[in-house]
């Protein structure tokens, strides 16, 4: 797949951003906010996901302070990603399957929506100065594991909606997607943990 997958104008056509989730999850974060938090917590390892898993209090603090938001577990497939703040939405060919509100995120200059595998061995240089993170498969197909969005600095309450295409299309078309919405707030009031499986089910590909 070429860069036409990225949300850029070609004439009057706006192409979709399609995210490959080889690691069964999506995360939202802002590079500078994340780096400041890791420095404050004296975290030097690049294995950020494992560090959060091994340090539950640090993980909860990261959610409370809007450092990142992990959305797990979802099928390891490609999803169409849209941000309502960029005037993006799913049309009537899609059916909304769920909506969850009130997750914290702090943004400085830009927001990344990426495959959670980015946090296995985090390399900030993959993101700095780039609009997307991509890689090529052995058969020459380009897949995208992260997209950058221009979002004003500040604190936000995040909502996530899951969508399914009403009439499934054949591969390589994506039949599932997520719509994110950011509402600016002055301060965070509490926080929600998206890993509370009894409360949340983000696996839109498995929702009937």
What role is predicted for each listed range?
Residues 114-115, 159:
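Beta-strand residues in well-ordered beta-sheet regions across diverse protein folds
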Residues 146, 155-157, 175-177:
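Extracellular structured ligand-interaction cores
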Residues 142, 165-167:
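Charge-rich, acidic-biased intrinsically disordered regions
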Residues 1-107, 111-113, 124, 128-131, ...:
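Primarily secretory-pathway and cell-envelope proteins
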Residues 118-122, 132-135, 140-141:
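Nucleic-acid endonuclease domains
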Residues 139-150:
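Beta-sandwich interaction modules
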Residues 151-160, 164:
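A glycine-anchored, Pro-Gly-centered beta-turn/N-cap motif
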